[in-house]
């Protein structure tokens, strides 16, 4: 089947997870919104987790989440794949298995061929099929700027749930995918990188976090998150706050896409990076080169899992991630200690 050659990037200024609302503004907005109270609700928005969780019975809990955004790449089919992988990731980050999805689509009734929308949906369906979930329908509205994503329902055993609040002092931090997605995509739009770096970024965004979720269960991991629009620092902040720990990150151990550090040194810094640095604010104590600090705040789209694993099992976890053939970049990037002062993130 022929695929559309329409360039989706011509329709947007900000794409992917870099289009998220400023996290500081979002926190302020949600502050006065009343939370539901029910003994069956295991996770709500108070801990800024990746999804909500509702206990059905002693053996099953529902994971519910949604995610959508404007195009992050030119090709409609690839955009569909990335957006679906990003939405499904929230379920994986909670240690669950995606079960049912609904397509969420915003698309103009005029100006862009309808075949483009068909390609987006086909790309999304490829990734949904890879996850083992089932598409049950969706909703589409007329919007001048295309957007696509999913509402996802997953399941998890209540005793195997992974949350932001599950990190313990003494554990090591493992990251499954490289950083630099935001930098690479900005550089691509400016013509600063070749196809090799661009395709590497695309490949990471299309990759499901399924293998990482399965290994979290094998290793008994209970504290983790996925790294998306708030960058590694922003999501690590949410882990640290919910778990009441301090996270120590070795910036030079963090995996990074090719050329991204040199791009940052040369000033290719997406605007979302500064937004994310404002979000972590005084909780960050950084003693590292500027380009590494910027890398850690880079907004990721469909990024990897940041897991907290017992120190004596961290190297085995990384080896297992490598053996999947899907996560060659996986690495130990730091550790957790008891929180002692306002600094929840210490970067060296």
From Swiss-Prot:
Catalysed reaction equations from the record: hydrogenselenide + ATP + H2O = selenophosphate + AMP + phosphate + 2 H(+)
Manner of cofactor binding, per the entry note: Binds 1 Mg(2+) ion per monomer.
EC number of the protein: 2.7.9.3
Cofactor(s) recorded in Swiss-Prot or TrEMBL: Mg(2+)
Source superkingdom: Bacteria
Residues the record lists as binding Mg(2+): 50, 90, 226
Residues annotated as site: Important for catalytic activity: 20
One Pfam family recorded for the sequence: AIRS_C
Enzyme's top EC category: transferase
Presence of keyword Nucleus: no
Active-site residues annotated for this sequence: 17
SUPFAM superfamilies found in the cross-reference section: PurM C-terminal domain-like, PurM N-terminal domain-like
Cellular component GO terms held in the UniProt record: cytoplasm
GO MF annotation: an example: magnesium ion binding
Chain sites annotated for binding ATP: 20, 47-49, 67, 90, 138-140
Keywords carried by this UniProt record: ATP-binding, Kinase, Magnesium, Metal-binding, Nucleotide-binding, Selenium, Transferase
Protein family according to the UniProt entry: Belongs to the selenophosphate synthase 1 family. Class I subfamily.
Record function comment: Synthesizes selenophosphate from selenide and ATP.
Subunit structure: Homodimer.
PANTHER family (alphabetical): INACTIVE SELENIDE, WATER DIKINASE-LIKE PROTEIN-RELATED, SELENIDE, WATER DIKINASE
Official protein name in the record: Selenide, water dikinase
Organism: Porphyromonas gingivalis (strain ATCC 33277 / DSM 20709 / CIP 103683 / JCM 12257 / NCTC 11834 / 2561)
Name of the gene this protein is made from: selD
């Amino acid at each position: 089947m022929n695929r559309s050659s329409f360039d989706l990037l011509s329709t947007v200024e900000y794409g992917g997870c870099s289009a998220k609302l400023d996290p500081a503004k979002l926190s302020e907005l949600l502050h006065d919104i009343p939370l539901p109270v029910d003994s069956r609700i295991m996770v709500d928005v108070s801990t800024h987790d990746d999804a909500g969780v509702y206990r059905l019975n002693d053996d099953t809990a529902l994971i519910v989440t949604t995610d959508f955004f404007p195009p992050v790449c030119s090709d409609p089919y690839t955009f569909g794949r990335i957006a679906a992988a990003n939405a499904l990731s929230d379920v994986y980050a909670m240690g669950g298995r995606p079960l049912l999805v609904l397509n969420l689509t915003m698309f103009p009734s005029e100006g862009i061929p309808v075949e483009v929308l068909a390609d987006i949906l086909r790309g999304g369906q490829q990734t949904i099929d890879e996850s083992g979930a089932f598409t049950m329908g969706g909703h589409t509205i007329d919007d001048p700027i295309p957007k696509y994503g999913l509402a996802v329902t997953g399941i998890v055993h209540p005793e195997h749930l992974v949350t932001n609040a599950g990190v313990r002092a003494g554990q090591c931090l493992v990251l499954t995918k490289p950083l630099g997605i935001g930098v690479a995509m900005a550089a691509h739009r400016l013509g600063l990188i070749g196809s090799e770096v661009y395709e590497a970024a695309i490949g990471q965004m299309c990759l499901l976090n399924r293998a990482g979720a399965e290994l979290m269960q094998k290793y008994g991991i209970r504290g983790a998150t996925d790294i998306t629009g708030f960058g590694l620092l922003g999501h690590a902040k949410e882990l640290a706050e919910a778990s009441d720990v301090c996270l120590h990150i070795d910036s030079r151990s963090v995996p990074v896409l090719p050329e991204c550090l040199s791009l940052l040194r040369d000033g290719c810094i997406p605007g979302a990076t500064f937004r994310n640095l404002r979000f972590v604010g005084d909780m960050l104590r950084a003693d590292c080169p500027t380009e590494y600090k910027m890398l850690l705040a880079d907004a990721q789209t469909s990024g990897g899992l940041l897991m907290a694993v017992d120190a004596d099992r961290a190297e085995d976890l990384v080896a297992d991630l490598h053996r999947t053939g899907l996560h060659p970049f996986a690495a130990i990037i730091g550790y957790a200690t008891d929180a002692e002062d306002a600094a929840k993130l210490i970067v060296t």
